[in-house]
């Protein structure tokens, strides 16, 4: 099992030190949250059924944050968890995420999702009702630019002729897809991994079964490219070794660790966060 450290709601002044400490302690990577601007009074419901934050919560830009963290580390991997692509347009995502991948020496996977905060998507000038269909097209566009440098696309939501974007990555940039709907699982199966978040223990095997069926269908259609397929899950349970061993036996490759109480005054200091990381590492690494 690979352990990613959850980094969200933190003070910007601590982020680089958190990255250094996470690498020293032995985390595999860091997962960074994504929101641009949170409208007050939003009515959208988070998939957990709870309101996870207030509009004034700290959300530094994830790609900028990852680039800075990568510059002060050498082994740590990085992941937006998850980057809400449909509240943006695909060209800037391809340029920015591709650049982060290259400058981090490919210690980066683009974790994407359709998003749940419809008011934020609309605020940024995008249609929340088409976010899933647009995400499907966006991921094809990203792959075209990253793999070939010059691409064209003719879809329902994006339509453009031959267009170039250089420099292009000279290694494969993984795309991991979040969500538990049937559409999200199909989307994940077509790419490089699946990101699951806060699912009950009795729900996880069902979702994994659906994912494996979709993945088999994709491989039967286009063959196996030999690249690893990541399955990252956060179970809605207190973590322990036996639980993680069971998840690993079911095909889960990674999980995200919350090493301190997010946003809690008791964890505000960098020393408290480092102590939380060390305690988690002692228990699980």
Residues of each region from the PLM?
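Active-site-adjacent structural elements that line small-molecule/cofactor binding pockets in enzymes
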Residues: 1-285
């Amino acid at each position: 099992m690979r352990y990613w450290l959850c980094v969200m709601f933190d003070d910007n002044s601590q982020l680089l030190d958190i990255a250094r400490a996470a690498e020293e302690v032995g985390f595999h990577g860091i997962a960074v949250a994504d929101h641009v601007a949170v409208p007050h009074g939003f009515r959208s419901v988070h998939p957990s059924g709870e309101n996870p934050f207030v509009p004034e919560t700290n959300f530094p830009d994830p790609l900028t944050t990852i680039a800075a963290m990568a510059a002060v580390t050498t082994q740590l991997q990085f992941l937006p968890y998850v980057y809400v692509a449909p509240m943006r347009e695909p060209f800037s995502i391809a340029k920015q995420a591709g650049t982060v991948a290259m400058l981090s020496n490919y210690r980066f996977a683009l974790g994407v999702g359709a998003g749940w905060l419809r008011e934020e998507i609309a605020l940024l000038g995008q249609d929340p009702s088409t976010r899933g269909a647009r995400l499907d097209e966006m991921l094809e566009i990203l792959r075209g630019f990253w793999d070939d440098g010059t691409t064209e696309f003719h879809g329902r939501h994006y339509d453009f002729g031959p267009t170039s974007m250089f420099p292009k990555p000279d290694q494969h940039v993984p795309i991991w897809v979040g969500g538990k709907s049937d559409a999200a699982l199909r989307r994940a199966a077509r790419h490089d991994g699946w990101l699951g978040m806060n699912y009950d223990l009795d729900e996880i095997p069902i979702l994994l079964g659906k994912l494996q069926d979709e993945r088999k269908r994709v491989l039967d259609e286009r063959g196996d490219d030999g690249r690893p397929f990541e399955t990252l899950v956060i179970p809605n349970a207190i973590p322990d070794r036996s639980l993680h061993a069971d998840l690993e036996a079911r095909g889960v490759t990674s999980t995200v660790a919350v090493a301190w109480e997010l946003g809690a005054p008791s964890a505000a200091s960098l020393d408290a966060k480092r102590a939380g990381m060390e305690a988690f590492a002692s228990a699980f690494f």
